[in-house]
From Swiss-Prot:
Record carries keyword Flavoprotein: no
Name under which the protein is recorded: Electrogenic sodium bicarbonate cotransporter 4
UniProt cross-references to InterPro entries, sorted A to Z: Band3_cytoplasmic_dom, HCO3_transpt-like_TM_dom, HCO3_transpt_euk, Na/HCO3_transpt, PTrfase/Anion_transptr
Keyword Cell membrane found: yes
Reported function: Mediates sodium- and bicarbonate-dependent electrogenic sodium bicarbonate cotransport, with a Na(+):HCO3(-) stoichiometry varying from 1:2 to 1:3.
Encoding gene (name): Slc4a5
Cytoplasmic topological intervals: 1-515, 580-600, 653-730, 790-819, 887-922, 967-987, 1030-1116
Segments of skewed composition (Gly residues): 437-464
The species this protein was found in: Mus musculus
Gene Ontology BP, a term: mitochondrion distribution
Amino acid sequence: MKVDEEKAGVKKLDPTSYKRRQPEQDFPSIHIGFPVPSYSQRKSDSKGHLSGLQKVQWSLKPGKPQQELAGPGIRASSQGGAVDFTKRTRSPAAEQLQDILGEEDEAPNPTLFTEMDTLQHDGDQMEWKESARWIKFEEKVEEGGERWSKPHVSTLSLHSLFELRTCLQTGTVLLDLDSCSLPQIIDDVIEKQIEDGLLRPELRERVSYVLLRKHRHQTKKPIHRSLADIGKSVSTTNRSSARSSSAGPTLHRSTEDLRIRQSTSYGHLCHAQSRSMNDISHTPNTDQRKNKFMKKIPKDSEASNVLVGEVDFLDQPFIAFVRLVQSAMLGGVTEVPVPTRFLFILLGPSGRAKSYNEIGRAIATLMVDDLFSDVAYKARNREDLIAGIDEFLDEVIVLPPGEWDPNIRIEPPKKVPSADKRKSVFSLAEPGQMNGSVGGGGASAGGGGSGGGAGGSGAGGVGSGDEAEMPAMHEIGEELIWTGRFFGGLCLDVKRKLPWFPSDFYDGFHLQSISAVLFIYLGCITNAITFGGLLGDATDNYQGVMESFLGTAMAGSLFCLFSGQPLIILSSTGPILIFEKLLFDFSKANGLDYMEFRLWIGLHSAIQCLILVATDASFIIKYITRFTEEGFSTLISFIFIYDAIKKMIGAFKYYPINTDFKPDFITTYKCECVAPDTVNTTTVNASAPLAPNTNTSLYTPLNLTALDWSLLSKKECLSYGGRLLGSSCQFVPDLALMSFILFFGTYSMTLTLKKFKFSRYFPTKVRTLVADFSIVFSILLFCGIDACFGLQTPKLHVPSVIKPTRPDRGWFVAPFGKNPWWVYPASILPALLVTILIFMDQQITAVIVNRKENKLRKAAGYHLDLFWVGILMALCSFTGLPWYVAATVISIAHIDSLKMETETSAPGEQPQFLGVREQRVTGVMVFILTGISVFLAPILKYIPMPVLYGVFLYMGVASLNGIQFWERCKLFLMPAKHQPDHAFLRHVPLRRIHLFTLVQILCLALLWILKSTMAAIIFPVMILGLIIVRRLLDLIFSQHDLAWIDNILPEKDKKETDKKKKRRKEVHETAEKEVAMPQFLPPSVVKIPMEGIPSDPQNGIHCVARKRSSSWSYSL
């Protein structure tokens, strides 16, 4: 049954004239809403569409026509029979939005900048003044109009959203308006209002005059201004006062000009001139171009302008929503030079300014909502916009008025939820929305978005609550798929990496790369010196600091040039050092040549690595989950922290603090130079340096018998053969304390400067620059402090001549001639241990670097990485250089130093992590600098070793950030009420989390014990043991718990996915059957056959039917 609104006497509604009905009011309206079946429903398509239900609205009021809430052109169904209460988790608004938004692969819409201007009255003068703005969060002009508020989350009243919904239902909606100037837009809107009977023709000029008033924007001025700025402001003030004196005549001239233009024609061209004091131009003015706020607005953004105000000549609101075909520059309407695409106008009678302002804030907040902005761009009619508001209401959260002060501004969250999660409810295979009808009689059945509503049998949810909020599955990239072909994985890695090879070089030309190179370079040379010295001690200088420098430079640069993942940094590791020591001791005890024996072990290990590459053995890495990754990376981080502190404590042994110093016995502390017992009359060269106060004029050449030994310095005394005598001769200034200051100061300052990026001081670019170069600034500062004090702190010593550390060895190791023949095949067994160590170290580090949290867009290359590690192992074995493998901590530090974030972010929005600057330049430059460090020895000798130990400590601590294991360890020391809101704490019982963490701690302790003893030779085997332990955890923990605190293993992952697909298919088939079958009415539902109640306008009975767009209904 379709009702003609005009015949029924329906008038348009004033959305702001909402009044609470009093009990004593005569003839109250009765609104009865219930769903009516539409059997003309089309069958669900591939997207799972279900047609919306319909709602019939009654009003019984004698002598007074019905006020319509529905839009025009809406049909109703009057068929009787049983009502179809389909159990659905989606609201009709969500169904309609799915049809509006279409496919997800379409190009994204521009970001919207929304500005709200309110009409200000000053006597007879009026102007539009900017009162708030939005990009993501709301910023208000503070009281007094001198500054912007902090960005905050918009808090809207539910009533304002309902009023906005009614505004769009009753007002003028112009979609795809072909206009390019504000006067033309205003004329089109007014003409449409007059045609629809919403505005009297005699008010045309007055409304147009108000809407074309001058726009004054909020500008921010710095507190400290230069003299030039003060001079400009004074001259500007003089010109402003001159203009203000002639404001009255200008007003009349503008009004007269308006009458003349409108009397001639209503068709304006795009080059029409402004008719107001605003002098609206098509091009941005100087103030707009100089506005620094433009930096916060993303590129290619568009604007939506909201104009709200009250006037005394209107008796009902003037409401319009406009979308332009093409965005247009409206001159001074917008604060920044951004073209306008949307315009919302609300002018109403006087006395309701606060209500108008709240409606304006509501539409402005909706326009910056990710989902509603997409709806606004793609809406085809008024009903689509209403559906967008209804979807917003489906997800809205209401705060009780007695428990929350609306004046409190909510700080923007650190992480804003994506609109993709809300879009996912448009599919039948997804759980329901936040809000919806309960039971079976509403438009959307039970959709508990938090996991509760989707699981009930009566709610008709698709799946359980666990499925609704399960974390992302353990994703295995295509790089780890077993091909079954000889070198199949390696060939695919090469094909994947070749297209990216040119960009791997030009992507590295960025300022951020400089700080990354310096940071990693200092870490690498410190590592090379440390492990070089330890190798020299362990192998009797067959391998030392010089071999460590050259090997690091050669292996690292070749790997970064040709590997699959150039962000990985190669270095010597602790297990390799232990293996080298055991191998040297075994060779020495059995009379074998160490270098030749080592060469054959390296060759066999290289061949074994190539066999693993040829058979795609790297695919077993997919069984390495978070459990193994975190255990390995945490162990390496602890090793770095432990070694840094151990080195620092060692300084206290060489330069102890003088704890025996007693101030009372200061007179007994002395040290003097004593001549040798037998002093010959031997003369010495007079060119030898003496103390400044030594008298050398009496003896030339120098005669030791005539020398005053008590005046010589310590260095002179020892050089002339004298000896030091006294209780204070062994006193050393507090070098240990100074070393600790340098060590801890470097670490703490680096940590502070890294966090400075997120502080509130200085502009964003300055903070970013300081954070990127934090390591460099810290090293330079504390090197300067050390130089100022002039204490003999231990310095960095780099070899200055390129030659082997041991004089009796060369740069090439002969494979034959020094060991028995059986050594060559027998070396396969120790080579197998080395291969396991290399494979696990390399591939676990690669998994950590390539994890999805780093958002790497270029393909990984596990097989290609292992191939080059094997080749480099053979090359280093022939040249007698150390073996190299991926260094976990330094690689993580390399990733962190190259992270990219959004350059422009909305006020209040945290910079979004974009990914990592993937390139080969930084790695190659680091290792080239390491190689030429031999020639930089005169400069590097000024760097104190405690400063480099501080860099080591920072690397170890920084690599612990973001590790879930470390966060779970902290929970042992926190009461439950103070624990952070981690996602796994919401879904897994705390005792199960503690049990899982204890298992990891025990495994980590066992690995640490093995690493610290001679049993470290089996360390790589124990890393494989972590994978076995993880598989055994499936017997203790459920797959649900493991999905949150770890990852599901691949075969379990596949089973879970197949089970979910099967369950969703069954639910989808059941939903289709229920749509085709009529169901019985629940006992709580009253059925009213509409065909039996005819519309009778004479008796005041009006039946108005409209399409049901949501579970929300708002009646005035």
